C-alpha cells in the first residue's frame, strides 16, 4: 500500500542519480578529444587538488564536485584500454558505491568494470583504496584486467597474494589502488598489530574499500573469525584413543525428549551440529578408558570424545574436507574451494586427523583474532557489490549500516526459471538430473550443474560417464581446481556439460559459444609452459586435458617439450579449431624468440602468466617481446573467433545456457547466484532445481511435516512430486535456516563487539609504542599510575593517619623500584593521601632518570629500545592470556541464562573488569621490568 502511495524507494533513489549521469554523458565528447597524456595530466591535476585538502569534510565535498569529470575520464580510459564503455546503469552503480552503499547488480552486468569508477575517484585522495575479492585468482585477475585502466591514467596498482613477503606487501599496500582477498587483508591487519618494529607494519591507515561479492564476505564468512594462533602441545594418544572409542559407540536413532535419554550411546543434533553422550554412553566410555570421571580436570576426556563423535558424524570426507598430501584440508561450504592453512579450532581438526589416521598436528592457542564484521567496520568508507543483496538487506543495514540499492539491468532478462522437481529419494533425484542433463546436451545447449559437495559432484560425474556424456568437473579436488577459470570460461560452448561445486563467487562469466580471449591465452600457455617454465614448476598449472565420457577428469601428467607435438595434439574439443599453418609458423618463431631472450625453462608459472596477461592488455608497452606475444595472441584469438561466433549463434538459437540446481542451499541468495549464471546481459537461458525429500535442508530443518509427507507420498523414486504444501515446507525450511544462521552471526558480532573495543584500545597502545618517539613519558605515566594505585591499596582514607600501614606501603614501592632503597617511613608520615601520591610520583621520576643515566652509559639509545621491548612484550603476553580467559568466560557465561541473567551483559561486565585488570598488570609489569633491567656489558661477559 505504501509503495502505491509513495512509489518504490529504490526507483526514487535511482532518479536522484539521473542528472549526474546526464552531466557525465555531456562531458563524454569533450574528454574524448583529449590525448592519452592529457588524460594522465587531468588525473594528476585532480589528485593534487583533492589530496592537498586536509579537512575530511571539505575533501568529501571536493570528491562530489569532481565526480562527473572523474567518471567521464575513467569511461574514456576504459574505452581506449579495454574497449569497454560504461553503460549509464554502470555509472549509477559507481555512484552508489561511492556513497558507501551496496550495489545489487545481476550476473554479467559488469560489476568489476563498475568498481573502476569509485576506486579511481577515491584514490585521488592519496589515502589508498582496497578492492576486496573472495580468492587470490580473482584479485589477480582484476588487478591485471581492471588495473590497466588505472595504470593507463597514471595511478599505481598493487596486488596482495598469499606467498608475498612483508617488503612486497608494504610496497603493494602503498599503491593508490590495491587488490586483495578478505583473508589476506584481515591477517595482515592482525600481523601488523603483532609487529615488534614499525618497519614490519605493511598496511597504512584504512580509507575506502569496495568488496566484490559482498554477501559472500560479510555474511557467509561472518560466522568464522580470523585467528592467528601459536602451537600448544597436547597428548596425541588421547585423540587416537577417542577416535577408536567413537567407533564402538552406537548412535541413538532419535533425540532425547522431556529429559529422557533415547536408546544408544550418543545423540546427534545436526541442526545445532553437536553430539551429546547419553548416561549409557558415559558409563561405556568410563569403563573403556578405565576412569571414574570424564570431566576430571587433571585427566579430562569429555572434550576429546565429543570431538571424535563430531568428526565421525558431522565432518564428512569430500564434503567438509578433503585429504590432500596426507593432510585434512577444509572445504569452504559456500564456495566449494579448499582452504589450505586453515584449521578447525578447539581440537576438532586433530579429531578429524585421528579419524583419518593422519599425522596429528599440535593444537593451537589464539594470539590474535577479529571477525570480518569488525574488521571491515574499521574502514571509514565501505561499499560492496553483489548480484543478490536484497535477501540480506536487513542484516547489511543493522550490522554494517549499509544501504542496498538495486541497479537496473542494461538489457531485459530473458531467462526462464522452470518449476522445481521434487523426488521422494535422493537416488531418484540424481537419475532425473542425469537424464535432463543428457537431453539438454543432445539439444546442443550448454549445461551447468551446481552441486553442494565434492562427493555429490563425483556421484553425478559417474552417472554421466555411464550415459557417455562428456563433461568437465569443477570442485575442490586439487586436480580440478587449477583448471577453474578455463572450465568456467568454456562452460558456454555448444553441448558443454559442467559440474561445479557451489558456484558462488566463481568470478568468471559464462559466455555463450565460449570465450575466445581465454582460449587464446590457454593455447599460448600450452605451447610456452614446456619451453619457458622451470621443470619443478611445470605442474602448476599442468596443461589441461579434455574430459571424455570415461575419464575421471584432470590433467595430462606431463607436457611434451616439443613445440610441434603440443600444436598437433591440441584437442579440437578444448580449442574450437586447428590453427592454420601461417599462425603455427608465427607461434614457432615466437617460441624461439622467447626462449632466446627469457631463457630455456627459467620462468615460474606465475611469471609466464604475468607476461601473457600483460600481452593480453591493450595498454601501451615498449617491450618488444610483449608486443610480439600480443601479436600472436591476437592472431590466435581472431582465428578462434571465426568459429566461436558461429557457435554462439547456434547456442542462442538452441535456447542458451541451462542451469540445474541439485539441492536448495541454506540461503536463498546462493540459489539465486546459481540461477544468475544463465541469461546474462539479455541472453536466453533457463534454470531448474531438482530436490529430494532426503536433502539435508528438508531433513534437518523441515521438521515432522516433511517426514509425514515422505510416508504420505506412495510414488516411485523417479516420479517427481508436485504439491503446494511441499513448496511451502521448502520455503519455510529455507527461511528457518536463514534466521538460524543470522542469529548465530548476530551473536558472534555482539560478543566480538565487546572484544572489539578492547582490541582497539590494545592495538592503539601498541601502535603508539611502535611509532613512539616519547616512550619515556609513556613509561613514567605507567609508573605514576602504579604509585597512585599502591597508595589506594594500602591507605584507607577512613582511618586516621597514625593507623595507616606506611611500612607495608614502602615495602611494596621498593619491590617495584629498588633504587628507592633509602625511602623511610618518617619521610612520608605527615603527608596527606594526595601529597603522598605526589611525593612517590616525584621519587619515581628521579629514580627513572637515575636508571636511564646508568643504562645510557652502556650504550646510547639502549633505554628507548628497552622501553619499547618491555611494553610490547607485556602487551602481547597479557593480551594472549586475556584472549584465552575471554574464551573461557564466553563458554561459562552461557549457563547463567538458566539463572535468569543475560549472558551477554554478564560477558560485557566481567570482560570489562578482566580487561582493566590486564591493563593494570601490563603497566605494573613494565615498570618492574624497566627497573630490574640489567643489560650485560662486555666486561661482565669476559668475566
Curated annotation (Swiss-Prot):
Gene Ontology cellular-component terms for this entry are: cell envelope Sec protein transport complex; cytosol; plasma membrane-derived thylakoid membrane
EC number(s) stated in the UniProt entry for this protein: 7.4.2.8
* First-listed, main subcellular location of the protein, grouped into a coarse class: membrane
Which InterPro entries does the entry link to? Helicase_ATP-bd, P-loop_NTPase, SecA, SecA_CS, SecA_DEAD, SecA_motor_DEAD, SecA_preprotein_X-link_dom, SecA_SF2_C
Sorted alphabetically, which SMART domains does this protein's record hold? SecA_DEAD (SM00957), SecA_PP_bind (SM00958)
This protein's UniProt keywords: ATP-binding, Cell inner membrane, Cell membrane, Cytoplasm, Membrane, Nucleotide-binding, Protein transport, Thylakoid, Translocase, Translocation, Transport
The name under which this protein is listed is Protein translocase subunit SecA
Among PROSITE patterns, the record links this protein to: SECA (PS01312), SECA_MOTOR_DEAD (PS51196)
Kindly give the PANTHER family that the UniProt entry links to this protein.
Answer: CHLOROPLAST PROTEIN-TRANSPORTING ATPASE, SECA INNER MEMBRANE COMPONENT OF SEC PROTEIN SECRETION SYSTEM
The annotated subunit structure for this chain is:
Monomer and homodimer. Part of the essential Sec protein translocation apparatus which comprises SecA, SecYEG and auxiliary proteins SecDF. Other proteins may also be involved.
Q: Extract the ranges annotated as region (Disordered).
A: 535-564
The record's listing under Pfam families reads: P-loop_SecA, SecA_DEAD, SecA_PP_bind, SecA_SW
Q: How does it sit in the membrane?
A: Peripheral membrane protein
Q: Where does ATP bind?
A: 90, 108-112, 509
**Would the keyword Iron-sulfur turn up in this protein's UniProt record?**
no
**GO function terms (MF aspect):** ATP binding; protein-exporting ATPase activity
Its job: Part of the Sec protein translocase complex. Interacts with the SecYEG preprotein conducting channel. Has a central role in coupling the hydrolysis of ATP to the transfer of proteins into and across the cell membrane, serving as an ATP-driven molecular motor driving the stepwise translocation of polypeptide chains across the membrane.
* Recorded superkingdom: Bacteria
Q: Which organism is it from?
A: Prochlorococcus marinus (strain MIT 9215)
Q: Which reaction does it catalyse?
A: ATP + H2O + cellular proteinSide 1 = ADP + phosphate + cellular proteinSide 2
Task: Indicate where this protein resides in the cell.
Answer: Cell inner membrane; Cellular thylakoid membrane; Cytoplasm
Point out the gene that encodes the protein.
secA
Any one of the GO BP annotations: protein transport by the Sec complex
**Member of which family?**
Belongs to the SecA family.
Amino acid at each position: 500500500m505504501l509503495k502505491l502511495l509513495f512509489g518504490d524507494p529504490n526507483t526514487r533513489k535511482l532518479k536522484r542519480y539521473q542528472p549526474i549521469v546526464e552531466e557525465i554523458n555531456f562531458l563524454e565528447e569533450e574528454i574524448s578529444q583529449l590525448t592519452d597524456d592529457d588524460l594522465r595530466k587531468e588525473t594528476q591535476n585532480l589528485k593534487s587538488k583533492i589530496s592537498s585538502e586536509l579537512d575530511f569534510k571539505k575533501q568529501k565535498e571536493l570528491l562530489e564536485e569532481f565526480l562527473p569529470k572523474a567518471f567521464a575520464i575513467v569511461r574514456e580510459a576504459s574505452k581506449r584500454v579495454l574497449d569497454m564503455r560504461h553503460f549509464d546503469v554502470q555509472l549509477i552503480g559507481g555512484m552508489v558505491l561511492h556513497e558507501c552503499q551496496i550495489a545489487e547488480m545481476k550476473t554479467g552486468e559488469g560489476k568489476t568494470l563498475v568498481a573502476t569508477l569509485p576506486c579511481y575517484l577515491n584514490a585521488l585522495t592519496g589515502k589508498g583504496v582496497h578492492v576486496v575479492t573472495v580468492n587470490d585468482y580473482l584479485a589477480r585477475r582484476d588487478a591485471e584486467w581492471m588495473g590497466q585502466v588505472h595504470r593507463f591514467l597514471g595511478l599505481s596498482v598493487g596486488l596482495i597474494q598469499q606467498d608475498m613477503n612483508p617488503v612486497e606487501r608494504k610496497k603493494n599496500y602503498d599503491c593508490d589502488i590495491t587488490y586483495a582477498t578478505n583473508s589476506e587483508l584481515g591477517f595482515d591487519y592482525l600481523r601488523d598489530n603483532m609487529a615488534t618494529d614499525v618497519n614490519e607494519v605493511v598496511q597504512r591507515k584504512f580509507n575506502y574499500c569496495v568488496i566484490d561479492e559482498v554477501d559472500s564476505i560479510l555474511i557467509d564468512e561472518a560466522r568464522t573469525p580470523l585467528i592467528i594462533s601459536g602451537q600448544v602441545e597436547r597428548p596425541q594418544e588421547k585423540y587416537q584413543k577417542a577416535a577408536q572409542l567413537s567407533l564402538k559407540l552406537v548412535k541413538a536413532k532419535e533425540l532425547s525428549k522431556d529429559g529422557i535419554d533415547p536408546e544408544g550411546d550418543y545423540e546427534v543434533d545436526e541442526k545445532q551440529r553437536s553430539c551429546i553422550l547419553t548416561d549409557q554412553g558415559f558409563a561405556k566410555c568410563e569403563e573403556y578408558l578405565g576412569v571414574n570421571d570424564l570431566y576430571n580436570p587433571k585427566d579430562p576426556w569429555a572434550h576429546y570424545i565429543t570431538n571424535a563423535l563430531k568428526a565421525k558424524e558431522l565432518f564428512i570426507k569430500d564434503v567438509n574436507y578433503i585429504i590432500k598430501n596426507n593432510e585434512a584440508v577444509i572445504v569452504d561450504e559456500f564456495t566449494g574451494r579448499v582452504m589450505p592453512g586453515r584449521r578447525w579450532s578447539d581440537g576438532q581438526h586433530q579429531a578429524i586427523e585421528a579419524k583419518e589416521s593422519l599425522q596429528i598436528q599440535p593444537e593451537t592457542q589464539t594470539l590474535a583474532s577479529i571477525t570480518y564484521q569488525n574488521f571491515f567496520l574499521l574502514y571509514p568508507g565501505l561499499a560492496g557489490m553483489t548480484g543478490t543483496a536484497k535477501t540480506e538487506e536487513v542484516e547489511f543495514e543493522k550490522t554494517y549500516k549499509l544501504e542496498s540499492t538495486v541497479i537496473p539491468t542494461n538489457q531485459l532478462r530473458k531467462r526462464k526459471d522452470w518449476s522445481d522437481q521434487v523426488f521422494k529419494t535422493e537416488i531418484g533425484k540424481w537419475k532425473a538430473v542425469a537424464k535432463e542433463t543428457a537431453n539438454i546436451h543432445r539439444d546442443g545447449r550448454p549445461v551447468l550443474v551446481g552441486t553442494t559437495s565434492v562427493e555429490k559432484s563425483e556421484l553425478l560425474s559417474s552417472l554421466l560417464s555411464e550415459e557417455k556424456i562428456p563433461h568437465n568437473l569443477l570442485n575442490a579436488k586439487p586436480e580440478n581446481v587449477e583448471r577453474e577459470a578455463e572450465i568456467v570460461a568454456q562452460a558456454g560452448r555448444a553441448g558443454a556439460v559442467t559440474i561445479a561445486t557451489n558456484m558462488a563467487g566463481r568470478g568468471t562469466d559464462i559466455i555463450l559459444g565460449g570465450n575466445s580471449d581465454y582460449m587464446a591465452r590457454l593455447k599460448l600457455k600450452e605451447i610456452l609452459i614446456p619451453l619457458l617454465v622451470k621443470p619443478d614448476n611445470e605442474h602448476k598449472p599442468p596443461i589441461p586435458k579434455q574430459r571424455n565420457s570415461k575419464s575421471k577428469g584432470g590433467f595430462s601428467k606431463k607436457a611434451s617439450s616439443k613445440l610441434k607435438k603440443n600444436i598437433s595434439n591440441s584437442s579440437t574439443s578444448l580449442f574450437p579449431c586447428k590453427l592454420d599453418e601461417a599462425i603455427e609458423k608465427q607461434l614457432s618463431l615466437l617460441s624461439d624468440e622467447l626462449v632466446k631472450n627469457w631463457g630455456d625453462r627459467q620462468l615460474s608459472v606465475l611469471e609466464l602468466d604475468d607476461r601473457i596477461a600483460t600481452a593480453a592488455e591493450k595498454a601501451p608497452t615498449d617491450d618488444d617481446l610483449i608486443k610480439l606475444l600480443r601479436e600472436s595472441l591476437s592472431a590466435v584469438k581472431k582465428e578462434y573467433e571465426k568459429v566461436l561466433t558461429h557457435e554462439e549463434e547456434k547456442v542462442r538459437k538452441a535456447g542458451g545456457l541451462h542451469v540445474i540446481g541439485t539441492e536448495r542451499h541454506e540461503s536463498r541468495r546462493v540459489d539465486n547466484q546459481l540461477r544468475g549464471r544463465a541469461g546474462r546481459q539479455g541472453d536466453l537461458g533457463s534454470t531448474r532445481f531438482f530436490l529430494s525429500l532426503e536433502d539435508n535442508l528438508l531433513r534437518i530443518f523441515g521438521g515432522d511435516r516433511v517426514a509425514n509427507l515422505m510416508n504420505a507420498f506412495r510414488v516411485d523414486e523417479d516420479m517427481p512430486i508436485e504439491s503446494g504444501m511441499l513448496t511451502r515446507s521448502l520455503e519455510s525450511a529455507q527461511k528457518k535456516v536463514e534466521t538460524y544462521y543470522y542469529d548465530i552471526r548476530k551473536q558472534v558480532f555482539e560478543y566480538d563487539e565487546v572484544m572489539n573495543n578492547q582490541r582497539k584500545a590494545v592495538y592503539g597502545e601498541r601502535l603508539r609504542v611502535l611509532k613512539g618517539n616519547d616512550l619515556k613519558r609513556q613509561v613514567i605515566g605507567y609508573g605514576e599510575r602504579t604509585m597512585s594505585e599502591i597508595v589506594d591499596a594500602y591507605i584507607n582514607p577512613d582511618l586516621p593517619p597514625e593507623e595507616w600501614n606506611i611500612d607495608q606501603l614502602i615495602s611494596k614501592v621498593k619491590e617495584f623500584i629498588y633504587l628507592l632503597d633509602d625511602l623511610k617511613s618518617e619521610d612520608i608520615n605527615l603527608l596527606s593521601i594526595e601529597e603522598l601520591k605526589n611525593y612517590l610520583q616525584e621519587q619515581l621520576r628521579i629514580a627513572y632518570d637515575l636508571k636511564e643515566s646508568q643504562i645510557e652509559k652502556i650504550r646510547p639509545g639502549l633505554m628507548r629500545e628497552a622501553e619499547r621491548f618491555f611494553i610490547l612484550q607485556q602487551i602481547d603476553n597479557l593480551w594472549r592470556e586475556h584472549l584465552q580467559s575471554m574464551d573461557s568466560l564466553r563458554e561459562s557465561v552461557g549457563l547463567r541464562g538458566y539463572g535468569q541473567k543475560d549472558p551477554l551483559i554478564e560477558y560485557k561486565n566481567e570482560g570489562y573488569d578482566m580487561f582493566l585488570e590486564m591493563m593494570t598488570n601490563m603497566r605494573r609489569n613494565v615498570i618492574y621490568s624497566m627497573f630490574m633491567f640489567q643489560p650485560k656489558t662486555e666486561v661482565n661477559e669476559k668475566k
